[in-house]
Regions:
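Long, aromatic- and glycine/proline-rich binding clefts that accommodate carbohydrate-like moieties
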Residues: 39, 45-47, 142, 298, ...
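A structural signal for short loop-to-beta-strand junctions that line the ligand-binding cleft
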Residues: 105, 128-166, 201, 307-312, ...
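Hinge/lid segment of periplasmic solute-binding proteins
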Residues: 30-44, 109-158, 184, 214, ...
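Extracytoplasmic/periplasmic solute-binding protein
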Residues: 148-152, 157, 181-231, 238, ...
């Protein structure tokens, strides 16, 4: 990311927390939504003839689902069938479906799967300059003057904690840890055992290492990629130190366990774990699947009280993709629905709330409904010290995850696990065109 973009993010984010609602434009008060990207709500779709398209996603809280309902009310002749696949199944089923002519006309995208999907994507039928005028951060997604998707929000990792468990342990807001050493002590207080059996984990990172290691490495000034910007930088002393730190939380401090389930998301939702590291999407996960959990959020600790090299990575949640292999009739409807999403401020607001993330649409960055969001208020002070490495290939996370599992479950030593993961990452990226954007961070 270029420095001017980061400055614009900081200014806009500060405004988000300090100002009130932006009034609707005169166009929005009539039949047209949007600023530069506009949508005519009265224009017929598919010449008014009945048509059905599919929208695929992996997320029950996907904001496009809610907007699909309002779109269908505007256009009763259009039916949008939402198909929800679990995350792990999604990336197997979607590419197979897109190869033929019967795949979904429009679908949810995660930028870590850019290479997997790029050959199936139809460029947006919206002028790129209009997108740039309405949204922050479009430029990194421009290819040959067009975009296949952009970021609707940007987010990063935080620590979520169970408020009831926190209170039961005698902790208050004054005990929010700033450093990892303080965090270890808090985690111990939150841990409950019956004999040798772990009943309540003080901190559970089972399933979250792939994202957690990146922020820990950044805090110590170690980038994810080597100086050439293309070679993974996983097998190093920083990664080793940080993985040992996480393992020691379990094996030395006893605040969690590799055997305490494989999914920290579910464990926190079932109120078996007191703290987890999660990104903005987790707020909506709790709202939709675990509404009884009373939770709080605080910034991920650092290794000292001094400002680190960076606090963490940040990433964007992507706008939907259009299937270029679908029929022209279906693609036109999909493009129309997409324009409805991007012109409609409500889509950005729903995304910001669903993912607890910073909205990229300029017209909603000052909306007062976002000011009280607990996650946004925690992200705000750190926004200038977050790194965007670009949409790196999935192996940077999948291979790292395997390394941690090898250490935890198979007794593989740290050096061997890191060497194996590094080798796998390099093998997977041998023919990649990816170039890290970390060098632009200042």
């Amino acid at each position: 990311m270029k420095k001017p973009l980061m400055k614009s993010l900081l200014v806009a984010f500060s405004a988000l927390l300090a100002t009130s609602v932006v009034p609707l434009s005169s166009a929005q008060a009539n039949d047209t939504l949007g600023q530069k990207v506009q949508y005519d709500t009265k224009a017929p779709v598919n010449d008014g003839k009945d048509i059905s398209i599919q929208y695929w996603t992996w997320n029950d809280g996907d904001p496009a689902i809610k907007l699909a309902e309002s779109y269908q009310k505007l256009h009763p002749n259009v039916k949008i069938e939402v198909v929800n696949h679990p995350w792990d199944d999604y990336w197997t089923k979607l590419p197979l479906a897109l190869q033929g002519s019967d795949g979904p006309a429009i679908f949810n995208i995660h930028n870590s799967q850019d290479k997997l999907l790029s050959s199936y994507l139809e460029a947006y039928d919206i002028p790129t300059e209009d997108l740039k005028a309405d949204f922050t951060g479009v430029e990194p997604h421009v290819v040959d003057g067009k975009v296949n998707y952009i970021d609707i929000v940007m987010n990063t990792g935080n620590i979520y904690y169970n408020k009831k468990m926190w209170q039961a342990a005698g902790l208050t807001d004054k005990d929010i840890p700033k450093t990892w050493d303080e965090f270890r002590q808090v985690a111990k207080k939150l841990t409950i055992k019956e004999g040798d059996n772990l009943v309540q984990a003080g901190f559970n990172w089972n399933g979250s290492y792939a994202g957690l290691y990146q922020g820990l490495n950044y805090q110590k000034g170690t980038l994810l990629f080597q100086e050439d910007g293309t070679t993974p930088n996983y097998n190093n002393e920083t990664t080793k130190e940080n993985l040992k730190f996480l393992v020691d939380l379990y094996e030395v401090d006893g605040v969690g366990s590799k055997d305490f389930g494989t999914d920290d998301t579910q464990s926190f939702g079932n109120q078996q774990s007191a703290m987890v590291y999660k990104w903005g999407w987790f707020a909506n996960e709790l709202k939709t699947k675990y509404p009884d959990v009373e939770y709080g959020v605080f910034a991920t600790p650092t290794f000292s009280k001094d400002q680190p090299f960076a606090y963490d990575r940040y990433n964007g949640e992507s706008t939907p993709g259009i299937n270029k292999n679908q029929s022209e009739e279906q693609r036109k409807v999909a493009q129309d629905f997409l324009k409805y999403l991007l012109a409609n401020d409500q889509y950005s607001l729903e995304a910001a709330k669903a993912y607890a993330s910073y909205p990229t649409k300029n017209s909603v960055q000052e909306d007062k409904s976002l000011k009280s969001d607990p996650v946004l208020s925690v992200i705000a002070p750190r926004i200038k010290k977050l790194i965007w490495p670009g949409p790196f290939p999935a192996t940077m996370e999948t291979s790292a995850k395997k390394a941690a599992e090898e250490v935890l479950y198979n007794g593989v030593d740290l050096d061997s696990a890191l060497e194996n993961a590094q080798r796998q990452m390099e093998r997977d990226m041998r023919n990649e065109s990816f170039k890290s954007l970390e060098s632009a961070y200042q």
